[in-house]
């Protein structure tokens, strides 16, 4: 059977989180009543002239710098002409031959792999969004309604080179791209609200060939899982067509998430079909290098850089670093807690396990989490300093969730500080040995797990306050080292 290679390129539209639209002063707030955020410019009324939103331009430059793009110092806007009910002007203001950013790329790692992969970018350009069509759910009322709140919302379109060879690569590429966009705070990337949308361009070719096959563009991909599923389905469909000797036209398809298949929408338009020409209402933009460098100075530490620092400087395992740096707010929370605790690994464990566990369960952001990073840092410091055990820490944590008290106050009020009185601990250890002779016998026959039962007895009697290290030390002194198994 013939073997094929999959070729994938992605086009991502990210809505920029500006307060007003790209060429007008209308607001961009999601969820407002239909057609309540419009003005003559986004309605396309005669005589209404566009004026570029400076903040949208800056955010586009910042995105380009974050992905290592070259910034075009001489750039312009073009009219992309097509007719659709949600496009009142009859054209979309976009960028054609002079995009604001060119080149660059996205670095990502596939789960379970150590080496990073890199997908080149073709360009990033600015454009305005179209409106939204809302179709009647009643088949007896065949009507559609137009909401132009979204018309004129600023977008950047991030176009990749056809460098991806599997749906897995596409999935992790998108996750990395989204992480960077959120880190630099140019977009909230909320797919449910439509602020991040993706189209996939998919083709196949015989392995070893350097010619591209017929391309299919897939739209209506409202999640990264949908992107992965749509690519997998389309690749199999194209392989079947090739093996049967059938051909097909370049086309646009929709992803049907109910039927789990791609459905033909129309034959694909080429760039000349849109009759691009420079927008006569908008002057060309001539950027100064100083302007670009000013934007560069505002860039935060990016996810990959931060992840590498957590591993190399803080000594965290790679997995911990990946979890902590996936979102900027989580990484900030961790570092703020670490400033207080001084113990990177213990702080990491608490943030990624206990705190993110609650955050994910309650479907909130870490910014909405009730316990501040400082208070968590204080709790972890008590553990690191040996003042409380991990078990007691969880009791303290439960109270932190429902009160404004700091960890040390809770520990003091409830008398939870670890017992370090050698004589008192030795008394309990002797009692544990005397009352757990079966465990002692198993330990002396080489079963190391038996020691846990004796330690558990000590911790129960001491209500979790005995110093675990001291308990283990005393037990080894009294029982001797673990003998080889008989």
Curated annotation (Swiss-Prot):
Catalytic activity reported: L-glutamyl-tRNA(Gln) + L-glutamine + ATP + H2O = L-glutaminyl-tRNA(Gln) + L-glutamate + ADP + phosphate + H(+); L-aspartyl-tRNA(Asn) + L-glutamine + ATP + H2O = L-asparaginyl-tRNA(Asn) + L-glutamate + ADP + phosphate + 2 H(+)
PROSITE patterns named in the record: GATB
EC number: 6.3.5.-
Keyword terms: ATP-binding, Ligase, Nucleotide-binding, Protein biosynthesis
Keyword Cell membrane on entry: no
Keyword Metal-binding (UniProt): no
Domain of life: Bacteria
Pfam families referenced in this protein's UniProt entry, alphabetically: GatB_N, GatB_Yqey
SMART domains given in the database record: GatB_Yqey
EC primary class: ligase
Molecular function via GO: asparaginyl-tRNA synthase (glutamine-hydrolyzing) activity; ATP binding; glutaminyl-tRNA synthase (glutamine-hydrolyzing) activity
Single Gene Ontology BP annotation: glutaminyl-tRNAGln biosynthesis via transamidation
HAMAP family: GatB (MF_00121)
Subunit structure: Heterotrimer of A, B and C subunits.
Family: Belongs to the GatB/GatE family. GatB subfamily.
Function: Allows the formation of correctly charged Asn-tRNA(Asn) or Gln-tRNA(Gln) through the transamidation of misacylated Asp-tRNA(Asn) or Glu-tRNA(Gln) in organisms which lack either or both of asparaginyl-tRNA or glutaminyl-tRNA synthetases. The reaction takes place in the presence of glutamine and ATP through an activated phospho-Asp-tRNA(Asn) or phospho-Glu-tRNA(Gln).
Name by which UniProt lists this protein: Aspartyl/glutamyl-tRNA(Asn/Gln) amidotransferase subunit B
Gene that encodes the chain: gatB
């Amino acid at each position: 059977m013939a073997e094929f290679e999959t070729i994938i390129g992605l086009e991502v539209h990210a809505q920029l989180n500006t307060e007003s639209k790209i060429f007008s002063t209308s607001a961009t707030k999601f969820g407002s009543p239909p057609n309540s955020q419009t003005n003559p410019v986004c309605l396309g009324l005669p005589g209404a002239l566009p004026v570029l939103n400076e903040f949208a331009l800056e955010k586009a430059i910042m995105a380009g710098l974050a992905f290592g793009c070259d910034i075009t110092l001489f750039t312009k806007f073009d009219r992309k002409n097509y007719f659709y009910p949600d496009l009142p002007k009859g054209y979309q203001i976009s960028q054609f031959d002079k995009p604001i950013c060119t080149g660059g790329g996205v670095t990502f790692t596939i789960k379970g792999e150590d080496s990073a992969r890199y997908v080149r970018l073709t360009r990033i350009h600015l454009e305005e969004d179209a409106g939204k069509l809302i179709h009647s759910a009643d088949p007896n009322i065949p009507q559609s309604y137009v909401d132009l709140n979204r018309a004129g919302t600023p977008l950047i379109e991030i176009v990749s080179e056809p460098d991806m060879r599997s749906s897995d690569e596409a999935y992790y590429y998108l996750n990395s791209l989204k992480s960077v966009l959120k880190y630099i705070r140019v977009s909230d990337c909320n797919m449910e609200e439509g602020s991040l949308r993706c189209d996939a361009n998919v083709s196949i070719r015989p392995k070893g060939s350097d010619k591209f096959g017929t391309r299919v563009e897939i739209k209506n991909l409202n999640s990264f899982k949908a992107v992965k599923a749509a690519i997998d389905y389309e690749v199999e469909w194209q392989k079947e067509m090739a093996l049967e000797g059938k051909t097909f036209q370049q086309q646009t398809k929709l992803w049907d998430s109910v039927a789990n298949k791609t459905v033909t929408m129309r034959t694909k338009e080429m760039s000349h079909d849109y009759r691009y020409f420079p927008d006569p209402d908008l002057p060309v933009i001539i950027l100064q290098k100083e302007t670009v460098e000013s934007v560069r100075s505002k860039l935060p530490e990016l996810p990959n850089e931060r992840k590498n620092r957590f591993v190399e400087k803080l000594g965290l395992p790679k997995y911990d670093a990946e979890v902590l740096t996936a979102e900027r707010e989580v990484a900030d929370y961790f570092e703020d807690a670490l400033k207080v605790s001084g113990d990177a690994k213990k702080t990491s464990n608490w943030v990624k396990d206990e705190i993110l566990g609650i955050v994910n369960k309650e479907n909130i952001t870490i910014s909405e989490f009730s316990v501040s990073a400082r208070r968590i840092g204080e709790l972890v410091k008590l553990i690191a300093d040996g003042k409380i055990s991990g078990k007691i820490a969880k009791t303290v944590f439960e109270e932190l969730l429902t009160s404004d008290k700091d960890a040390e106050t809770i520990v003091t009020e409830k008398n939870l500080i670890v017992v370090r009185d050698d004589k008192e601990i030795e008394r309990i250890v002797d009692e544990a040995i005397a009352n757990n002779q079966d465990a002692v016998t198993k330990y002396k026959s080489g079963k190391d797990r038996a020691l846990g039962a004796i330690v558990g007895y000590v911790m129960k009697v001491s209500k979790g306050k005995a110093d675990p290290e001291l308990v283990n030390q005393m037990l080894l002194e009294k029982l001797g080292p673990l003998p080889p198994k008989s």
